[in-house]
Amino acid sequence: MSEESDSLRTSPSVASLSENELPPPPEPPGYVCSLTEDLVTKAREELQEKPEWRLRDVQALRDMVRKEYPNLSTSLDDAFLLRFLRARKFDYDRALQLLVNYHSCRRSWPEVFNNLKPSALKDVLASGFLTVLPHTDPRGCHVVCIRPDRWIPSNYPITENIRAIYLTLEKLIQSEETQVNGIVILADYKGVSLSKASHFGPFIAKKVIGILQDGFPIRIKAVHVVNEPRIFKGIFAIIKPFLKEKIANRFFLHGSDLNSLHTNLPRSILPKEYGGTAGELDTATWNAVLLASEDDFVKEFCQPVPACDSILGQTLLPEGLTSDAQCDDSLRAVKSQLYSCY
């Protein structure tokens, strides 16, 4: 008998092995840092991230989740947990609270976060309500451009716009570059009417701002507002009480003065609609990026929520603004506030 046939005869096949004898499945690939050397340095200086301690820090956060929230349905992958550590400058306790808030917000606002996928928001994406500019600013921040005038309230409720914003942020935060550099928001309020502005009352404002500040692992480095009408004073009066001082100081109101905008965002990265040299505003490219991510969003946001997740508190629900009647009263107050701007 040949050596080959003897080998075949004496080597057990996988099918013949008992369950206990089966080789263990291969472990998923570990975290591989995609940051450039410059971004590694930036993360060290600004976020207290030390490459030599990175995986130790991730494991520490993972252990805290397992110990303090054993029933929390969440990813514990290195890359996912790093988002929260970076957003809280590697403070374990604050990163853990941010992670819990992130999931609590998703549970407490199902109108926004349930079934959150690009195909469910085709109308919003087609409207041009928001996009991400193709070029980053000098600090490496992606620029999210929001244009409320593109929204027609009779077509769909304001919560669909909010869903599109969170969809975009979820996609952006997958990038380690964005986790380190953060984002900039460019909001164009040209043509926003009183009736349209009244849809953004305190109930919605507090929830959106609460999530962005305390329930989402994103670093908002600046908010540039252009072409704001007089009623924006009323809109900002609604928003400001909910803003932390650090975030409030990052709001810049430029009016129609594009030269003022260009001192912060160079013309080379802006479309011609904002006095830039980067061509016309392109919404199709970013829409295509989102639509190509459909499967990822279905996996993350379109699955049944485990019953055990009900242990999460409603940590960021606006106090005293939970009933429909209270929301109506709030909107009446908003309209009075906005009328006073005229």
Curated annotation (Swiss-Prot):
GO terms for cellular component: membrane. The keyword Transport applies. Keywords: Transport. Residues 117-282 form the CRAL-TRIO domain. SMART domains: CRAL_TRIO_N, SEC14. Residues 8-19 have a biased composition (Polar residues). It comes from the Eukaryota. The gene is TTPAL. This is Alpha-tocopherol transfer protein-like. Residues 1-31 are annotated as: Disordered.
